[in-house]
């Protein structure tokens, strides 16, 4: 049986307390995971500070660029190991893990290496009345030891999205992956060891949230900043702990994202895009659309076409190359999603597709599978329409005017993303800017330029990451002002 240990101060550390890593494909045990206690988290934080006081704290930006590229190269060399671990932990199809999760996880290190290598220096010249002048420039410095708490839906991608810029800025990190997906984080620690990164720069601690590693990190007085992706409720708990220490936080939380489909859209292109927006990763992407607004003239056509597409969607073994949807992350999460299927029935929804659990007649029946599901007929104040479900389910409803759909789409406590489908260029710009979200896609979905800002409004998060926005979060700027006299004093 595989053992996933903690990695602290450059050493692999076992724990007296362990838990099981279970695959959602068939409910079998993948590995035994060693849970970090408070003392081990404290040791990780101290190791991070020692690294900052030693060799790592003296690295230049150019040296850190080289480190990030070496990490990416070693990850690429072990790409198959990362694929196997990611698919075992999550059950996501090979078609997704091999084209999105693992390549993007590697690309995050290369991308932030490139950004750091070309990052502009904020500098200004101020001319003074006596003929002298002042030169001001911003010196970028690390925050210190950053607590990184990452989610289970895109485990490697979102972990490296945080770790790469944190290291680029010269920080040390204490990483806690989700208890549901410890595999690729452990492999990343192996990569750090293989490339020889100084002890204490990258520390990995396994565990849960309350009364475990997540809480120990968020409450630690010597953690300099916290970055978290996950549920809004957990984010609120972490924020309260961070507020007591007055430390920076970056949160990417939940979403109840809207798709707005106008009658003038390219219908087939829209259908292709919406199948991804609804069911990629079994709907377990914070950017997935759970509320779909369709202009009335094409509403019936859309419902029929979507139901037909779902019938053809292949829900099968993740390692099959043509599988399009796998299981949910866990039996616990499957039960949550199924409870919303039942709530939809109680609230009077019409099921256009799905609504149950697929039966395979083999060991997969012990896994965490649900059917891709589409419902209709609910009011905008129904709980199923307002609460984040985070599964392969959406509610479709018609609308009659642009102003109506903007109002309805914005009627939510969340504000992460929206996708808009129209061939009217003016409408595309107009509606996109009126959506109260962090990102609006037009005639596409999940198309990401890693240099651009990413984050949400309302309950969907605090702050922006991506490109220079990430470097600005993970560093402090000191303005250096130097007066240059007009003449040398010895002239």
UniProtKB/Swiss-Prot annotation:
Protein function: Involved in the modified meta-cleavage pathway for 2-aminophenol catabolism. The enzyme is also active toward 2-hydroxymuconic 6-semialdehyde, acetaldehyde, propionaldehyde, and butyraldehyde.
Assembly, per entry: Homotrimer.
Protein name per UniProt: 2-aminomuconic 6-semialdehyde dehydrogenase
A GO molecular-function descriptor: aminomuconate-semialdehyde dehydrogenase activity
Thermal effects: After heating at 40 degrees Celsius, the remaining activity is 40% of the original activity.
Keyword Oxidoreductase annotated: yes
Superkingdom classification of source: Bacteria
The entry's keywords: Aromatic hydrocarbons catabolism, NAD, Oxidoreductase
Active site per the UniProt annotation: 252, 286
Source organism per UniProt: Pseudomonas sp
Catalytic activity: 2-aminomuconate 6-semialdehyde + NAD(+) + H2O = (2Z,4E)-2-aminomuconate + NADH + 2 H(+)
Gene that this sequence comes from: amnC
A GO biological process held by the record: catabolic process
UniProt key word Electron transport: no
Listed EC numbers: 1.2.1.32
SUPFAM superfamilies documented for this protein: ALDH-like (SSF53720)
Activity regulation behaviour: Strongly inhibited by Ag(+) and Hg(+), and comnpletely inhibited by p-chloromercuribenzoic acid.
Family: Belongs to the aldehyde dehydrogenase family.
PROSITE patterns xref list: ALDEHYDE_DEHYDR_CYS, ALDEHYDE_DEHYDR_GLU
Biophysicochemical property: pH dependence: Optimum pH is 7.5. Stable in the range of pH 6.0-8.0.
Gene3D superfamilies in the record: Aldehyde Dehydrogenase, Chain A, domain 1, Aldehyde Dehydrogenase, Chain A, domain 2
Pfam families found in the cross-reference section: Aldedh
């Amino acid at each position: 049986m595989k053992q996933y240990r903690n990695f602290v101060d450059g050493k692999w550390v076992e724990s007296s307390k362990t838990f099981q890593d279970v695959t959602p494909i068939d409910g079998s045990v993948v590995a035994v995971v060693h849970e970090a206690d408070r003392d081990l988290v404290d040791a990780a934080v101290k190791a991070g500070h020692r690294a900052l006081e030693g060799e790592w704290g003296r690295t230049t930006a150019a040296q850190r660029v080289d480190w990030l590229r070496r990490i990416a190269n070693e990850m690429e060399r072990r790409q198959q190991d990362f694929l196997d671990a990611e698919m075992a932990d999550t059950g996501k199809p090979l078609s997704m893990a091999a084209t999105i999760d693992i390549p993007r996880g590697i690309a995050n290190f290369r991308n932030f290496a490139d950004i750091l290598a070309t990052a502009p220096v904020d500098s200004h010249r101020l001319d003074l009345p006596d003929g002298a002048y002042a030169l001001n420039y911003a010196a970028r410095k690390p925050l210190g030891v950053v607590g990184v708490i990452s989610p289970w839906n895109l485990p490697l991608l979102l972990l490296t999205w945080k770790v790469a810029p944190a290291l680029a800025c010269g920080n040390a990190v204490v990483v806690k992956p989700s208890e549901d997906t410890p595999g690729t984080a452990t492999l990343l620690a192996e990569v750090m060891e293989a490339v020889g990164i100084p002890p204490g720069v990258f520390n990995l601690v396994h565990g849960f949230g309350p009364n475990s590693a997540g809480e120990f990190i968020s409450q630690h007085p010597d953690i300099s900043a916290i970055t978290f992706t996950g549920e809004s409720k957990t984010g609120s708990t972490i924020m309260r702990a961070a507020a007591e220490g007055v430390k920076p936080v970056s949160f990417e939380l939940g979403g109840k994202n809207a798709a707005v489909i106008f009658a003038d859209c390219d219908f087939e292109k829209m259908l292709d895009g919406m199948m991804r927006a609804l069911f990629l990763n079994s709907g377990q992407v914070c950017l997935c659309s759970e509320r779909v607004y369709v202009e009335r003239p094409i509403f019936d056509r859309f419902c029929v076409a979507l139901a037909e597409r779902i019938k053809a969607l292949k829900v099968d073994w993740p390692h099959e190359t043509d599988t399009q949807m796998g299981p949910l992350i866990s039996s616990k999460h499957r039960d949550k999603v199924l409870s919303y299927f039942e709530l939809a029935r109680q609230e009077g929804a019409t099921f256009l597709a799905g609504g149950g659990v697929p039966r395979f007649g083999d060991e997969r029946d012990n896994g965490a599978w649900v059917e891709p599901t589409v419902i209709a007929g609910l009011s905008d104040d129904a709980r199923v329409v307002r609460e984040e479900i985070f599964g392969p389910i959406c509610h479709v409803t018609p609308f009659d005017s642009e102003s109506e759909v903007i109002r309805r789409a914005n009627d939510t406590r969340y504000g992460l993303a929206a996708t808009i489908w129209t061939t009217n260029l003016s409408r595309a710009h107009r509606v996109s800017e009126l959506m109260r979200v962090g990102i609006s896609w037009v005639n596409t979905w999940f198309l990401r330029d890693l240099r651009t800002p990413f984050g949400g409004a309302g309950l969907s998060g605090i702050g922006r990451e991506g490109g220079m926005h990430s470097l600005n979060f993970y560093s402090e700027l000191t303005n250096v002002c130097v007066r240059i006299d007009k003449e040398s004093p010895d002239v």
